């Protein structure tokens, strides 16, 4: 039965869904990496697809930008479509000095300036963390493929254009690897609904050093990350 935001039918989604922010990126993943692909939803042009990777069923769907958007889609996938594993695949801006362009960052935990997890937890702090079994498998796959990987805390920001110019130096001091806009929300929804979640990010720019990938480097880095994510998806 369709939800307000996903017009797929029961059974259309695999137990594991890879989720980029951009729905066109979801389309690219499906067409590039999966076989026997079927588009299963398109409400608001938030495309979802299901296919196979090395013979195993995998789905991919966009989640939009920011915590409010991704929380809607992740909630409905888990609560209404029986999805058990959500793996966010996206990009981040690095802040720690030892994190470099094209590294893969795996969010073991996700700090945030959003209040969504406090709302869930009676205004208390909630430690938004990845599922360890997904985390362990992703690190294993990255090392097997010789993809440079950093594992640790990320920061999920509500504002892309932040007025807090000094916040990134504070993040670096506290050991935060990089900044995205969704991980903390996804981890909160998954915990609330009893599912597993992981965030895998490619470093597209370094916020403090002012470095950025070229379009060609960005694509290669994304493809490397996707191979890690897909191998994780079929081995959990």
Swiss-Prot record:
Reaction(s) the record says it catalyses: a purine D-ribonucleoside + phosphate = a purine nucleobase + alpha-D-ribose 1-phosphate; a purine 2'-deoxy-D-ribonucleoside + phosphate = a purine nucleobase + 2-deoxy-alpha-D-ribose 1-phosphate
EC number(s) recorded for this UniProt protein: 2.4.2.1
Gene3D superfamilies: Nucleoside phosphorylase domain (3.40.50.1580)
Transferase is among the record's keywords: yes
GO MF term list: purine-nucleoside phosphorylase activity
Enzyme type, top EC level: transferase
Active site: 205 (proton donor)
CDD domains in alphabetical order: PNP_EcPNPI-like
Residues involved in a purine D-ribonucleoside binding: 5, 180-182, 204-205
InterPro entries, per database record: DeoD-type (IPR004402), Nucleoside_phosphorylase_d (IPR000845), Nucleoside_phosphorylase_sf (IPR035994)
GO CC terms, sorted: cytosol
Keywords from the named record: Glycosyltransferase, Transferase
GO biological process assignments: purine nucleoside catabolic process
Binding positions for phosphate per the UniProt entry: 21, 25, 44, 88-91
Keyword Metal-binding tagged: no
Site note Important for catalytic activity, residues: 218
Similarity field: Belongs to the PNP/UDP phosphorylase family.
Role, per record: Catalyzes the reversible phosphorolytic breakdown of the N-glycosidic bond in the beta-(deoxy)ribonucleoside molecules, with the formation of the corresponding free purine bases and pentose-1-phosphate.
Subunit-structure text: Homohexamer; trimer of homodimers.
Name this polypeptide is given: Purine nucleoside phosphorylase DeoD-type 2
Upper classification of the organism: Bacteria, Pseudomonadati, Pseudomonadota, Gammaproteobacteria, Vibrionales
């Amino acid at each position: 039965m369709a939800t307000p935001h996903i017009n797929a039918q029961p059974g259309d989604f695999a137990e594991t869904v890879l989720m980029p922010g951009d729905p066109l990126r979801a389309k690219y993943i499906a067409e590039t990496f999966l076989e026997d692909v079927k588009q299963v939803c398109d409400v608001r042009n938030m495309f979802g697809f299901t296919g196979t990777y090395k013979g195993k069923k995998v789905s991919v769907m966009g989640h939009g930008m920011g915590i409010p958007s991704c929380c809607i889609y992740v909630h409905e996938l888990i609560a209404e479509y029986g999805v058990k594993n959500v793996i966010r695949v996206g990009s981040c801006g690095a802040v720690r000095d030892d994190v470099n362009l094209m590294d893969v960052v795996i969010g073991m935990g996700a700090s945030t300036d959003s209040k969504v997890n406090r709302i869930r937890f009676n205004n208390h702090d909630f430690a938004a963390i990845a599922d360890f079994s997904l985390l362990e498998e992703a690190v294993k796959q990255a090392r097997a493929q010789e993809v440079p990987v950093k594992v640790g805390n990320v920061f999920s920001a509500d504002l892309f254009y932040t007025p807090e110019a000094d916040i990134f130096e504070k993040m670096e001091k506290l050991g935060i690897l990089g900044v995205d806009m969704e991980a903390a929300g996804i981890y909160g929804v998954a915990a609330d609904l009893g599912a597993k979640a992981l965030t895998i990010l490619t470093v597209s720019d370094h916020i403090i050093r002012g470095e950025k990938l070229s379009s060609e480097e960005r694509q290669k880095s994304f493809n490397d990350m996707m191979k890690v994510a897909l191998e994780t998806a079929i081995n959990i």
